[in-house]
Every structure is written in C-alpha cells, then in structure tokens.
C-alpha cells in the first residue's frame, strides 16, 4: 500500500513539474518573440537579450547558444523570486527585461509596488505589472502589448 501511495505521489509531482516546465517553455517562446536575436550592433546585449558580463565574450552567437543563455538567465531570474511561489516565473520574465533591482530594490531604490503587493499577499497585480511599459518616461504601446500578453499567459490564478 505504501508503495502505491509513493508511486502515486511521484506521478502527481511529475505532472506538476511538467506543467511548470511547459509554462517555462511558453515564457521562453514569448521572450524570443519580443526580444529577437541581437548581434554585435546591440553591444552589450547578445542573443535574446543576454547582457554580457565582465570577462564574457561571444564573437559568433549561434541560435543554440543564444537559446541556452536565455534559459540560464531566466532560471537565475526565477530563482531570485522563488519566495513568491507561482508568481516567480512572471516576475522572472519581467526582471529579464527591466532588471531585478527595479523590482526588488537596491541601495537607494525602494522595492516596487508590485513586489510590495505580493509580499502583503495581494495577488491583484495586473495594473502594477503592466505599468512597466515606459521607455524614457513615455508609455510605449508595443511594450504594453508585451506586458499584457506575458500577464495573460503566465499569471496563475
């Protein structure tokens, strides 16, 4: 009996992991669609928005390398927001584009309203999430559409 309970639990866990993995794949596809492939003209960004770190150099970026860099970066961003549970992927995708420090705060920069609401237990974050659509102080419609799509496909109710 214990064996069957253990097997059932493992199968249930595997189903949850697969669901999260498939959502991760959707997030990767969404980022690829909006970021596009960066080449040397977009220095210091390469591949699908990977920012070169000191000491890194990728003179010739293939699609496969760009994809693996995107996945590694997105996993790091999601790990930074692990404490938010189901919202960690959504916050990781946003941080991939705007940076972790804009959300979590650092130095003189305070925490974002989005993070403060989630910490308070309020998951009604649509307005705060889609507010990250500005470039140089002006709202950009294409960025707003991106945020709307990200929220629609990645927010777990």
Predicted regions and their residues:
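Short N-proximal segments of mature Sec-exported proteins
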Residues: 88-102
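Hydrophobic h-region of N-terminal signal peptides that target proteins for export
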Residues: 8-18
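Short, glycine/acidic-enriched capping/hinge loops at junctions between secondary-structure elements
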Residues: 42-43, 57-59
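Early exported N-terminus immediately downstream of N-terminal targeting peptides
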Residues: 42-46, 50
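Positively charged n-region of N-terminal signal peptides that target proteins for export
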Residues: 1-3
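Long, amphipathic alpha-helical surface segments
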Residues: 16-38, 50-54, 61-83, 100-157
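Residues that flank catalytic or metal-binding motifs in active/ligand-binding sites
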Residues: 27, 42, 87
């Amino acid at each position: 009996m214990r064996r069957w309970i253990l097997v059932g639990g493992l199968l249930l866990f595997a189903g949850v992991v697969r669901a999260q993995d498939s959502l991760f794949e959707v997030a990767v596809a969404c980022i690829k669609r909006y970021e596009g492939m960066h080449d040397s003209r977009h220095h210091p960004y390469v591949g699908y928005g990977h920012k070169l770190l000191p000491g890194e150099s990728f003179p010739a970026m293939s699609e496969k390398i760009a994809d693996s860099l995107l996945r590694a970066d997105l996993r790091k961003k999601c790990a930074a927001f692990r404490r938010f549970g189901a919202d960690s992927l959504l916050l990781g995708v946003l941080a991939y584009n705007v940076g972790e420090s804009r959300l979590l705060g650092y130095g003189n920069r305070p925490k974002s309203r989005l993070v403060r609401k989630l910490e308070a237990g309020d998951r009604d974050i649509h307005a705060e999430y889609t507010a990250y659509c500005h470039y140089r102080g002006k709202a950009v419609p294409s960025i707003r559409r991106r945020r709307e799509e990200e929220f629609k496909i990645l927010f777990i109710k």
